[in-house]
Amino acid sequence: MASRAPLRAARSPQDPGGRAAPAATGRAPLPSAGWCPLPPGRNSSSRPRLLLLLLLLLPDAGAQKGDGCGHTVLGPESGTLTSINYPHTYPNSTVCKWEIRVKTGERIRIKFGDFDIEDSDYCHLNYLKIFNGIGVSRTEIGKYCGLGLQMNQSIESKGSEITVLFMSGIHASGRGFLASYSVIDKQDLITCLDTVSNFLEPEFSKYCPAGCLLPFAEISGTIPHGYRDSSPLCMAGIHAGVVSDVLGGQISVVISKGTPYYESSLANNVTSMVGYLSTSLFTFKTSGCYGTLGMESGVIADPQITASSVLEWTDHMGQENSWKPEKARLRKPGPPWAAFATDEHQWLQIDLNKEKKITGIVTTGSTLIEHNYYVSAYRVLYSDDGQKWTVYREPGAAQDKIFQGNKDYHKDVRNNFLPPIIARFIRVNPVQWQQKIAMKVELLGCQFTLKGRLPKLTQPPPPRNSNNLKNTTVHPKLGRAPKFTQALQPRSRNDLPLLPAQTTATPDVKNTTVTPSVTKDVALAAVLVPVLVMALTTLILILVCAWHWRNRKKKAEGTYDLPHWDRAGWWKGVKQLLPAKSVEHEETPVRYSNSEVSHLSPREVTTVLQADSAEYAQPLVGGIVGTLHQRSTFKPEEGKEASYADLDPYNAPVQEVYHAYAEPLPVTGPEYATPIVMDMSGHSTASVGLPSTSTFRTAGNQPPALVGTYNTLLSRTDSCSSGQAQYDTPKGGKPAAAPEELVYQVPQSTQEASGAGRDEKFDAFKETL
């Protein structure tokens, strides 16, 4: 019985109370309106008991029996059932019995979305009973009644069959009930009334039963923009095309922040109403196979669109009008395709060139306000070769699927195929229309590749004779009154759509929901693009980090006060340019300690030499008599010009063996190193060629005056000069040194100036000797 077709309860149009018409089985209808119930307390229960007795004695006429049945859809794996008039008050003295069967070996779970049955008589006349099994061998699971009863726990059967019995007697209120069922393995079953407010998770997956297209429920919103949080989940899923009303199915929901406005649309026979601001909305996760297949974009060429006939005429201005098949492109300006004839034999055909997975179709009317033409209902046929056609039916259905069309000439209406169609050719066969058959179409779907084999490519249909309706239409003659052309009838039976009165064979519907494999190019791009993006991002980060680290390293290396010179190598290079001296002089260099002046500003003190470096300024040699004196103990300052006038304090070293040209200053006085001055009394100043000003620097921009007396040179010197050199005591306001006195100066910063000056002065010194 798993292949049993879903059934819906039918209501008689003559019965305003909504009671079901008697089944066409030859049995008499149950007594209803002509019977008056007895007052309470006087055999008031005799009528319900009589109805129940008659119901049990009648032969089985289907899955439901009685006059108390409401909205009912009983599917092979799930379904929905309600009491009569739900959600309004159910009438007095009604009865309904539902017999539910699923696949052998399965069990059934029942869950109530709403339960409101009056319990004033302690479940004596108004109640709901559930039984294990069907028929006389059934056993009772439970008897239920109560207004606003919260039945949160589901009820499970012991076998694959259950019976649900609803009885109503005399009562004053009560909406009745709404229940849903499914096989036992659907652990996440929900009812048709559940909304997102019943769940706390931002994302979740639930199973919707069949039959959730409720006539009394309302939804707001559309896909992909989202649905208002007050919309029932399963009914919104039907509108979105992710679940079938006949079969039910799994839905995946994502909750997000609401929007101020929700638009209205018609899809899958569900009308979405306009909605306003809500705190949240929800959308559905889909397989992604809902893209357009090329009618609007032009991927489907004009020759791939054909029709049974074409509406052509000449207007009062003498202009020809032809609403050809290639005009049936959705959202393209201009007129639509329109058929010349107005019968159910007309069709619009689309060739996709190869098999594709078709998941939906969108239609609209003429889109012209002066031509209120549209198709309100249609069938869909499909084929692999364009010759043998199959009418689309829902799984397990015995009748062709009639799709809800448009209700006006300009709004879009969407219908989804569940399960999808796998075919190359699609035909739309209108069965109802407004004035004339006119429509624009777009197909939804994606590429189809069955795992394990290549896509099936079919050859185009062979050319037919001139009477083929798809290829030939009679064009009107020019200059005559408006004239309509009628296509000739086809000779081949395969070209003619099925008449409504004809009996059709069971279609070979490809009931498969296999997700198509993505083509190699798409899969390769999906993998390479993220990898390339990540690789480029990583490379950029590495380059930025390396550049930043290098800048920091350079900055750290540039914070030294003075560079460190190799004393030994520099000293040996200088000695080669000077006359030989005694070893004693070379082994007694003067060193000055580095006072912690590096923490002072450049204007306060000058930069001092490092404590472990004995670096001396080269002497300036003039035309003097005697041997070359020991070089000056002053070190040139890097990065500063000779005119910089900051003081450079030095700590005088205390040594037992004094340098030949320097003596320590008294402890009480300022400690300044002074230049070594040679006695020039016996020589001409013109031969020296050096200025007589001192190169000592003072605080300020003016050069200091040289004053003081000269001390005699020590006996360790190599010079025999008659003059005596003395240390100068720094005192302000003294006159400058005499021009005849030779002073040592700080060498120039550039190598060229120092080298040239040294050569010239050394030559002058040799000439003097």
From Swiss-Prot:
Biased composition (Basic and acidic residues): 757-769
UniProt xrefs under Gene3D superfamilies: Galactose-binding domain-like, LCCL-like domain, Spermadhesin, CUB domain
Residues annotated with Phosphoserine modification: S601
Pfam families linked to this entry: CUB, F5_F8_type_C, LCCL
Disulfides per UniProt: C69-C96, C123-C145, C212-C234, C289-C446
Residue span(s) of domain CUB: 69-184
Protein's UniProt keywords contain Cytoplasm: no
Stretches in topological domain Cytoplasmic: 545-769
Transmembrane segments: 524-544
Localization: Membrane
GO molecular function: signaling receptor activity
Occurrences of domain F5/8 type C (ranges): 289-446
Protein topology in the membrane: Single-pass type I membrane protein
Positions of the LCCL domain: 184-282
Stretches for region Disordered: 1-39, 455-476, 719-769
Residue numbers on the Extracellular membrane side: 64-523
Polar residues compositional bias, start-end: 465-474
Single GO BP term: negative regulation of cell growth
Presence of keyword Phosphoprotein: yes
Residues bearing carbohydrate: N92, N152, N269, N471, N511
Signal sequence bounds: 1-63
Keywords: Disulfide bond, Glycoprotein, Membrane, Phosphoprotein, Signal, Transmembrane, Transmembrane helix
Cellular compartments per GO CC: cell surface; plasma membrane
Protein name (record): Discoidin, CUB and LCCL domain-containing protein 2
Species, as recorded: Rattus norvegicus (Rat)
